[in-house]
């Protein structure tokens, strides 16, 4: 039906015409095609004209090659602006080889407590699957400006961070019930900070980081299990430094990260229920930079601990979520999702030498209204356990509105 070109098929499938049929190769090729959002490919195996031959039939439902969204949320902080506006765009098959390009922009909007505050972020990425290999390039840039209130005089601060990475992955093994991937990557991280246009050498750094990731995904009858192990190792190359001043410790680091995820679905009294669990653990043999350490508490770890939490380099957290999708007969929304979650996390405390470790817990309750082009979500998160030394809000209300085009 001309929805797939010969070039796309050649890049997607790790097979040659006339070769011995391997069903795993076919599955890999279909997965590569469907990694592009505009494709929805399925495969059927039919008898070939020659004895012992097989005809591989592909059917593809082709949709628009680009899509995007615009949204607003209140995930910022009061000092620099609680409300955030963001937009993103995805372009599929940019070079005609099943590749995808992604670009996003976000900025703070609305009132803020500081006299002047601006923050913006930009991201650009590109990915390409070919046979059993996967390539990806990622770039992100963040900049900020703000006026800080002093006891005598106000002063201005500004800065930026620019991260670039390249990754190469390979599917080492796949079966009917699972697959094993190995990837290696390299990251450059560059941060610059200024006070009154004076460069802050002690808080500005260039880091080069190698990483190695092993991922296994197991397909269940009603769900999946994913396991990921990461090794990160910084190296003092080129314009990076081991230390900025003689009194500072060597900030080159090695850290290990382990993630496990599980999701499934079941029914209770004819009502579909979805359950998801995610655990993330980090270990480093010595103190590492705050930007590379673990934060246990916040929207993306233990919910309910607003704008902060435990900081360390040995610990982790577990998140549990249950969601109930509901179909409606209303003109809008076509679908409603109710969700609830409970989280817990533990970390060592290098900022509090008298304490070895502490733990926190939190919860969330909310709903999402959505259809194909528009969605609204609302959630209320509350801390269930917070150590006395953490002086911060123990609840938060989040909302977001998003339009897809």
Name each region found by the language model.
Residues 89, 367-374, 393-405:
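Outer-membrane beta-barrel "beta-signal"
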Residues 52, 81-85, 118-122, 160-164, ...:
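Residues that define the transmembrane beta-barrel architecture of outer-membrane proteins
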Residues 45, 70-74, 101-107, 137-143, ...:
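Transmembrane beta-barrel strands of outer-membrane/channel proteins
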Residues 1-76, 106-120, 278-279:
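Periplasmic polypeptide-binding modules associated with outer-membrane biogenesis and secretion
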Residues 69-74, 83-109, 120-143, 167:
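Predominantly transmembrane beta-strands of Gram-negative outer membrane beta-barrel pores used
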Residues 66-68, 95-101, 131-137, 174-180, ...:
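Repeated loop/turn-to-beta-strand initiation elements of outer-membrane beta-barrel proteins
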Residues 194-335, 342-344, 348-350, 389-391, ...:
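C-terminal outer-membrane beta-barrel translocator/porin domains of Gram-negative envelope proteins
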Residues 114-216:
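Transmembrane beta-barrel wall of Gram-negative outer-membrane proteins
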């Amino acid at each position: 039906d001309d929805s797939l070109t010969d070039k796309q098929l050649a890049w997607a499938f790790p097979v040659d015409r006339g070769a011995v049929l391997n069903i795993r190769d076919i599955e890999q090729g279909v997965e590569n095609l469907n990694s592009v959002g505009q494709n929805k490919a399925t495969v059927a195996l039919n008898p070939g004209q020659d004895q012992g031959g097989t005809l591989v039939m592909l059917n593809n439902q082709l949709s628009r090659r680009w899509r995007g969204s615009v949204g607003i949320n209140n995930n910022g902080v009061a000092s620099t602006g609680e409300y955030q506006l963001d937009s993103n765009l995805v372009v599929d098959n940019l070079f005609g080889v099943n590749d995808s390009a992604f670009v996003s922009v976000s900025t703070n909007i609305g009132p803020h407590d500081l006299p002047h505050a601006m923050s913006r972020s930009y991201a650009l990425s590109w990915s390409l699957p070919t046979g059993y290999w996967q390539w990806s390039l990622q770039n992100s840039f963040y900049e900020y400006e703000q006026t800080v209130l002093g006891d005598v005089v106000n002063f201005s601060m500004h800065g930026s961070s620019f991260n670039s990475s390249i990754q190469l992955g390979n599917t080492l093994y796949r079966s009917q019930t699972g697959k094993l991937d190995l990837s290696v990557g390299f990251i450059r991280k560059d941060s610059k900070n200024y006070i009154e246009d004076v460069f802050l050498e002690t808080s500005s750094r260039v880091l080069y980081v190698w990483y190695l990731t092993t991922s296994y995904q197991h397909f269940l009858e009603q769900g999946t299990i994913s396991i990921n192990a990461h090794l990160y190792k910084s190296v003092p190359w080129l314009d990076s430094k081991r230390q900025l001043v003689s009194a500072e410790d060597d900030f080159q680091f090695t850290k290990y990260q382990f993630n496990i995820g599980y999701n499934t679905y079941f029914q209770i009294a004819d009502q579909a229920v979805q359950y998801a669990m995610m655990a993330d653990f980090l270990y480093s043999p010595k103190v590492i930079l705050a930007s590379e350490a673990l934060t246990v508490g916040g929207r993306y770890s233990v919910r309910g601990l607003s704008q902060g939490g435990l900081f360390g380099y040995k610990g982790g957290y577990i998140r549990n979520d249950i969601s109930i999708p509901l179909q409606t007969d209303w003109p809008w929304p076509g679908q409603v999702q109710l969700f609830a979650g409970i989280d817990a996390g533990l970390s060592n405390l290098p900022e509090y030498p008298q304490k070895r470790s502490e733990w926190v817990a939190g919860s969330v309750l909310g709903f999402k209204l959505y259809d194909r082009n528009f969605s609204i979500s609302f959630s209320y998160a509350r801390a269930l356990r917070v150590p006395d030394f953490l002086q911060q809000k123990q609840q938060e209300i989040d909302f977001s509105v998003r339009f897809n085009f």
